[in-house]
Amino acid sequence: MASPSSLLSWPHRAISLSFQPKNPSPSPATARVSVQDPPPPPSDANPSPGRSSNTSRYVWVNPNSPRAAGLARARAGSGRRARLAAAAAALAACEAGEAPVAAALEAAFPEPPSEQDAVIVLNTTSARPAAVVLALWWFLRNAEVRKEVILYNVALKALRKRRRWSDAEALWEEMLREGVQPDNATFSTVISCARACGMPGKAVEWFEKMPDFGCSPDMLTYSAVIDAYGRAGDAETALRLYDRARAEKWQLDPVICATVIRVHSSSGNFDGALNVFEEMKAAGVKPNLVVYNTVLDAMGRAMRPWVVKTIHRELVSQEAVPNKATYCCLLHAYTRARYGEDAMAVYRVMKDEVMDIDVVLYNMLLSMCADIGYVEEAEEIFRDMKASMDSRSKPDSWSYSSMVTLYSCTGNVAGAEGILNEMVEAGFKPNIFILTSLIRCYGKAGRTDDVVRSFAMLEDLGITPDDRFCGCLLTVAAGTPADELGKVIGCIDRSSAQLGAVVRLLVDAAAPSEPLREAAGELLGGARGVVRMPYCNCLMDLAVNLSQMEKACALLDVALRLGIYSNVQTRTQTQWSLHLRGLSVGAALTTLHVWMSDLYAALQAGDELPPLLGIHTGQGKNTYSYKGLATVFESHLKELDAPFHEAPDKAGWFLTTSVAARHWLETKKSAELVAV
């Protein structure tokens, strides 16, 4: 141990280093101690609280102690970091030429840089891709490099960050020409670069090169290439790689699980996506927010909002903090499934959190509100859109279309016209969807002249009517009084001559049923599947409203023959049933008429009825009306004095016994069974 005299005679300058003591004294007095200073004068051990000192705190440190070495290293490390940051900034600021890059790096490194210095500069600089490659070459010539592949990997990573696939390929070729052997990190970087550049085929190609260079994929590589195979449409190979990774006992991590969930979702295998999510939890892997968002998106696409709610509750219970992507997934799921209350709750949370909501999300909400009759909620959303300062949130033509649809379905003519005027003032032209909704609105309100005026607007704008527009005109015709029906039929004629011919045969009381049967068969046989049932429903509604039951039955026969209505009647040993769910009122009454005639014919032929007969109307109600098919049918059955009564334990069913049905049928003539 050194003597006190040797310490006092130490020839070097005393070191004064400022630091926070590990156990500071509770005394507020400051200390400045140096062996070169004279002893301090005596002072009061308990100075007045009013006295204060701004003197900095210094403590002398023995230069031979470990603490001095640590402080010196910290000071040196701080200087090195600053020097490397300056070098990265200088590289970013210089031109992408060999001479400017060399000059900037030579100024930053008077002495040959280390390999770690080169890695830090290449990894942190924001230079152009060409400058990064030139800097790589300078470091390879001038730095103390032990493994050249490390610097190539860092440069490839920089090119990946800038999504420069062609530069990455060129650097790979340069690397091979120089005889540098790529490693796993090289392939992982190149594969993820291809994926980031939207080139999944290239990612797959590079993955398949790995065995040629003696490289085996690690978990990061598996994750990148599984996603690449999925994006390339080869879900089978992606999942086979996932199984291979598990077979090789790789530890599952959230990255690869999120990737596999996404692959399952993209291929439509939503059960598989959910299984991977449950499997990772069973393996002890805690899902992160990316995994939660991915599985929420998958379940939203699968139209499983109840699963979305469960996963969201789990996310919150795990104290994960939802982000904007989470709320977007929830909105997608709830609006697609028409879960109105849940969707509005998510929307209001996003508003409270002041999250950006673009016009796409707004339009999804408005479309949902229009479908389920959320008038006040839609008006709130539309006001928020117009009040937004962000141009990406302003209403577009789809926003106005949803609002017109909403008001049209509720019969709010003034509201629909007001939105149309706002739309025109905002610089948007009405499209076929808006005019379809507007015509439906005028039809509900009985304003036939406005229907004709709106149809003229369609012609003035040069819009070609589509089959949905024609279906809307059919709906309007079914509810139009006979004295104004010709105006609507004129619009139908100009929209579709074939449909107009069928309607004219239908409304002409003198025309026989057989020509109508043939014309309707040609029309419905060539129509798109999505509009065939609406056409049938509307045509039968029109026939029933015009008291043309024979023609309504002919239309039903055509629909059954073409398979438009299926399984309308079912028979078992214990029950014969009529299934009317999904039919319009006119189509349902027509089907009931035919069924009653069939029952009467069975009795006349001496057949035995089963113990139970039932009519299934479903229990749903029209979104914009308190009346559903069940309500209408209950009233109609009472008018007929039919013995069918609503089943207390089977919602939407009207049942009767064979005894009651037989008695009723025998007291009625077949032609009198249905009073329309």
UniProtKB/Swiss-Prot annotation:
UniProt cross-references to InterPro entries, sorted A to Z: Pentatricopeptide_rpt (IPR002885), PROP1-like_PPR_dom (IPR033443), Smr_dom (IPR002625), TPR-like_helical_dom_sf (IPR011990)
Cellular component, GO, one term: chloroplast stroma
Domain Smr positions: 578-662
Region: Disordered, residue numbers: 17-58
Record key words, sorted: Chloroplast, Plastid, Repeat, Transit peptide, Translation regulation
Compartments, record wording: Plastid, Chloroplast
PPR repeat start and end residues: 148-182, 183-217, 218-252, 253-287, 288-322, 323-353, 358-388, 396-430, 431-465, 532-566
A biological process from GO: chloroplast RNA processing
Transit peptide: 1-73
PROSITE patterns for the chain: PPR, SMR
Function: Involved in translation and accumulation of chloroplast ATP synthase subunits.
Name of this protein: Pentatricopeptide repeat-containing protein ATP4 homolog, chloroplastic
